[in-house]
Amino acid sequence: MESRGPKLLDRVRDAIRARHYSRRTEAAYVTWIRRYILYHHMTHPATPGAADISAFLTWLATKQRVSASTQNQALAALLFLYERVLHAPVGSVEHVIRAKQPLRLPVVLSREEVAMVLSHLDGTMWIIGMLLYGAGLRLEECLELRVKDVDFDRRQIAVKRGKGQKDRTTTLPGAVVDSLRTHLAHVRRLHEGDLKDGGGRVVLPDALDRKYPNAATAWAWQFAFPASRICTDPRWGPPSRFHLHESAVQKAIAAAARR
């Protein structure tokens, strides 16, 4: 059987980046599409394959015992493959044995529990924790904040393309203002150092770098919580700073909650 997996996956990556999906989404979609191809013995998915998708999703549920959310993510990746990359919509995917949705009660922390978690965080992680619990930001929203999104005068935070892909504003908690100012001053020094080294670029949304070539190095567009290292992967263009990785925050908060 003909296998054109690597070339196909490169096309998938290009389609994802053209739509400015997150790196996490890219990694997940590429992984699921690769597993799908392997499941079908390296057969290139050149034609619409609703039955092939159904078989794969059923296998995930019955043999791999994946969760409902994992199965749904796999389906989303495969629909993206056929509709956005191969331009061959599959229509309705039927006769799938669905993974069971676990019954979970939402975890809602009391004010005392939130205060306890925050008391075990410090530095950047404390600021992020304050924005998560005090400003009601989701983790992804918080880490994707740009310098320009923070309005100290109005005590507001602009959330771009938040939940439901909608823009909104939320209140900047007064308790975090001074610490956030100090933090951003440090970030600015980091950015100025990058500029002196010939860098200082940041990834921009919606292809703004093509419309405004200088925006990628502008202070206003820098991430409020940048990663400690510069990404030099050529697939992402010139060396750039991404935001802090979600896992670093998740680990810090989990450790604080266990204390």
Protein language model regions, located:
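Conserved catalytic core of the tyrosine transesterase superfamily
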Residues: 1-259
